[in-house]
Amino acid sequence: MHLNTSICEVDNPDLTEEREKGTFDTDKMAAVIYGSEKLARRRREISEAVSKIPELADTQPFPFMDRLEKITEGSRKLEVLNNNIRDIIDYDDNGERLHIYQEVTGMEGHPLALHEVMFIPALVSQASKEQQEKWLGRARRREIIGCYAQTEMGHGTNLRKLETTATYFPDTQEFVLNTPTTTALKWWPGALGKSSNYAVVVVDMIIKGKSYGPHPFMVQLRDEKTHIPLKGIVVGDIGPKMSFNGGDNGFLGFDKFRVPRTNLLMRHVRVEADGTYVKPPHAKVNHSAMVHVRSHMATGQGALLAQALIIAVRYSAVRRQGFLENKTQEVKVLDYQTQQHRLFPSLARAYAFIFTGFETIHLYSQLLKDVDMGNTSGMADLHALTSGLKSVVTHQTGEGIEQARMACGGHGYSMASYISEIYGIAIGGCTYEGENMVMLLQLARYLVKSVELIKSGEAKKLGPMVSYLAAKGGHPDLSSLNGYVTAFEHMARRQAWKATEKFLKLMESGESREIAWNKSTVELTRASRLHTRLFIIEAFMRRVSRIEDIPVKEVLTDLLHLHVNYELLDVATYALEFMSSTQLDYIRDQLYLYLEKIRPSAVSLVDSFQISDMQLRSVLGRRDGNVYENLFKWAKSSPLNKSDVLPSVDKYLMPMMEKAKL
């Protein structure tokens, strides 16, 4: 029995050679990645079950389809899946449900994507028990299809300035929804354009002439029998995008559209029949749907980065180019140190992001329980943390995927690699659910408040995630991982204090708070990034420390060492005032050492994500490594190759050439 369970006899021998170098069981590594042996095994079982249903296979490669074909193909597969899904998965298990959708439809989006990821979670976190009894069961059974509509054409991150209104009329106990301007149109929500017949819509709630800010409403958009938009609803598709073109992101407008008072989601707030407003226990409790998505983004982005690295690492193991010592056979591209430096730090980040995501998801689940018990003390901590993570993780994921594409050379530019599609999907995360710079500044506000508490002698009030800001700095001992944490704490602490002092001094000089803040934002965002990267390192360390399987723990410890050395070098300018050049040279040498240590395990590390070829959709990243013959096969399937002479050539180019001969 091979340690790497991906080995098969028909594979490219170069890839088999790499897999035989592995020192750990890839199934056991998968158990660490996905949380347990049972969860990892269920993923494999689901993938295998899906592979046995031929109707769920793509009718042609996705890159050769236009938008309508992609949406139609996604809907066709969902209909087939709906007839089989309860025989394959436990439908009440969110993880199994998400995995089977990814397996069947890939990552380009489908009509139920936001239904599962945003609509249902919004009902779970925002609707009262009575409202859940009315709508949640129908949503889970897919009697209705919903989405989450918050972003507007003119406003996204600044929720306080949302223009769509819901005005309450006590005499009829109804809210009237209205879109007063073009910029007030809801814009971008996935599945809104053509698929959803319901939406959780976030609007500015007005009662007796007073604005109460953004609140979520359950709104029916289309007739359940005909799917025609209801009177007073303007809804449609916003057109092609950089990616996600298997989905129908849409626009939505209201013209004096009435909904019952009880359509306001009332788990945390309430409006009485007479218009009395009962406010939530915490100012940001209505943001829980956003916090939910941001809590999962680290894991989701880590998975996207992992897919790009599966492709790039496998391809680098079968692609031969140039010579080293052996002049008779070209060397594997993966043997070049530059290729390792390009890919392995991103591989470490993929693991780090996934492990960090586990922590934030656990914190979010605990927060929901606490809020139900009336305890909202953890809301500010988690809101700040997930804001920073959302920004740092999406940005670094985009960087890593682009490096993976370039590491594949010219073929990486082809849609046959599928990396460009992964990139387009991943970098969407830099702007949806909050623009990244704004997210960093939300965390920065929390850091500034924390520093101000310390300055006022109230350090005891600090949350656990920022307690290090009150600690005394020291010189790091780089002989242990804790020494790297000490170094990162010092840099993050120093930058947080530096940015806060700059902000406060500007106000002392006479600048208004707003202007002083704006003039400090570059330093503040730097503080947020350092704080977030520190948390990721600590989350990675905590996860590795709990692993029981020795071979798995050893290779992940090597990956962790690679991660901390790379991360520290990446921000070395912040370390110049307290670390010597000798220490920085040591870190650089350690980085190169761990590149060499990871090299034999690289293919097994990416195989451990256990992403099927069906989901990966990459010719370059095929499990069997038989790239070149399948690249030729893929190219021949291009619709342009259905005829030897294109109509455009016959109609325009041939006459042009004939005319030139006269």
From Swiss-Prot:
Pathway: Lipid metabolism; peroxisomal fatty acid beta-oxidation. A motif (Microbody targeting signal) lies at residues 660-662. Changing residue 433 to A: In reb6; accumulation of ascaroside asc-C9 and reduced production of asc-delta-C7 and asc-delta-C9. No defect in indol-3-carbonyl(IC)-ascaroside production. GO terms for cellular component: peroxisome. The active site is at residue 433. SUPFAM superfamilies: Acyl-CoA dehydrogenase C-terminal domain-like (SSF47203), Acyl-CoA dehydrogenase NM domain-like (SSF56645). Its EC number is 1.3.3.-. It is an enzyme of class 1 (oxidoreductase). Activated by ATP. ATP binding leads to a conformational change that promotes FAD cofactor binding and enzyme activity. ATP binding likely occurs during acox-1.4 folding and/or dimer formation. It catalyses: asc-C9-CoA + O2 = asc-DeltaC9-CoA + H2O2. It is found in: Peroxisome. The keyword Signal does not apply. ATP binds at residues 341, 391, 395, 403, 526-529, 574. Homodimer. Involved in the first step of peroxisomal beta-oxidation by catalyzing the desaturation of fatty acid-derived side chains of ascaroside pheromones, which regulates development and behavior. Specifically, shortens ascarosides with a 9-carbon side chain (asc-C9) and, in association with acox-1.1, may contribute to the shortening of ascarosides with a 11-carbon side chain (asc-C11). May contribute to the production of indol-3-carbonyl(IC)-ascarosides in association with acox-1.1 and acox-3. Belongs to the acyl-CoA oxidase family. This is Acyl-coenzyme A oxidase acox-1.4. The lineage of its organism: Eukaryota, Metazoa, Ecdysozoa, Nematoda, Chromadorea. The gene is acox-1.4.
